[in-house]
Amino acid sequence: EQFDEEFDIT
């Protein structure tokens, strides 16, 4: 899934 840049993906 793709998240907005406001969320941190680690």
Swiss-Prot record:
<keyword id="KW-0964">Secreted</keyword>
<dbReference type="GO" id="GO:0005576">
    <property type="term" value="C:extracellular region"/>
</dbReference>
<protein>
    <recommendedName>
        <fullName>35 kDa cell wall protein</fullName>
    </recommendedName>
</protein>
<keyword id="KW-0134">Cell wall</keyword>
